[in-house]
Amino acid sequence: MVCIHTENQNQGGFYPFVLLEISVLHEPPLGHLRYRLTDVPPQPNSPPDNVFNPDQPRMGP
Protein backbone atom coordinates (compact mmCIF):
# COMPACT_ATOMS: atom_id res chain seq x y z
CA MET A 1 0.00 0.00 0.00
CA VAL A 2 2.91 2.33 0.61
CA CYS A 3 4.08 1.83 -2.99
CA ILE A 4 0.61 2.62 -4.33
CA HIS A 5 0.48 5.76 -2.21
CA THR A 6 3.85 6.88 -3.60
CA GLU A 7 2.69 6.22 -7.17
CA ASN A 8 -0.41 8.30 -6.58
CA GLN A 9 1.72 11.17 -5.33
CA ASN A 10 3.96 10.95 -8.39
CA GLN A 11 0.95 10.92 -10.71
CA GLY A 12 -0.52 13.87 -8.86
CA GLY A 13 2.65 15.83 -9.53
CA PHE A 14 2.70 14.72 -13.16
CA TYR A 15 -0.89 15.57 -14.14
CA PRO A 16 -0.56 19.37 -13.67
CA PHE A 17 2.29 19.37 -16.20
CA VAL A 18 0.21 17.39 -18.70
CA LEU A 19 -2.82 19.67 -18.26
CA LEU A 20 -0.63 22.77 -18.60
CA GLU A 21 0.95 21.47 -21.84
CA ILE A 22 -2.44 20.51 -23.28
CA SER A 23 -3.97 23.90 -22.48
CA VAL A 24 -1.01 25.75 -24.04
CA LEU A 25 -0.94 23.52 -27.12
CA HIS A 26 -4.69 23.75 -27.74
CA GLU A 27 -5.10 27.45 -26.98
CA PRO A 28 -4.13 28.81 -30.44
CA PRO A 29 -6.30 26.32 -32.40
CA LEU A 30 -9.27 27.05 -30.14
CA GLY A 31 -8.81 30.78 -30.61
CA HIS A 32 -8.58 30.26 -34.37
CA LEU A 33 -11.77 28.18 -34.35
CA ARG A 34 -13.54 30.90 -32.38
CA TYR A 35 -12.63 33.50 -35.02
CA ARG A 36 -13.65 31.14 -37.84
CA LEU A 37 -17.02 30.49 -36.18
CA THR A 38 -17.57 34.25 -35.98
CA ASP A 39 -16.56 34.84 -39.62
CA VAL A 40 -18.61 32.08 -41.28
CA PRO A 41 -22.20 32.95 -42.26
CA PRO A 42 -25.04 31.44 -40.18
CA GLN A 43 -26.14 28.00 -41.29
CA PRO A 44 -29.80 26.83 -41.38
CA ASN A 45 -29.27 24.42 -38.47
CA SER A 46 -27.14 26.85 -36.42
CA PRO A 47 -28.44 28.78 -33.40
CA PRO A 48 -29.61 32.39 -34.02
CA ASP A 49 -27.04 35.11 -34.63
CA ASN A 50 -27.71 36.69 -31.23
CA VAL A 51 -26.01 33.69 -29.59
CA PHE A 52 -22.68 34.55 -31.24
CA ASN A 53 -23.17 38.34 -31.51
CA PRO A 54 -25.31 39.53 -28.57
CA ASP A 55 -24.58 43.19 -29.47
CA GLN A 56 -26.23 42.95 -32.90
CA PRO A 57 -30.04 42.99 -33.20
CA ARG A 58 -31.61 39.65 -33.97
CA MET A 59 -32.75 39.22 -37.56
CA GLY A 60 -36.26 37.76 -37.31
CA PRO A 61 -39.86 38.48 -36.33
Swiss-Prot record:
<dbReference type="InterPro" id="IPR052997">
    <property type="entry name" value="RRT15-like"/>
</dbReference>
<comment type="similarity">
    <text>Belongs to the ART2/RRT15 family.</text>
</comment>
<feature type="region of interest" description="Disordered">
    <location>
        <begin position="36"/>
        <end position="61"/>
    </location>
</feature>
<protein>
    <recommendedName>
        <fullName>Putative uncharacterized protein ART2</fullName>
    </recommendedName>
</protein>
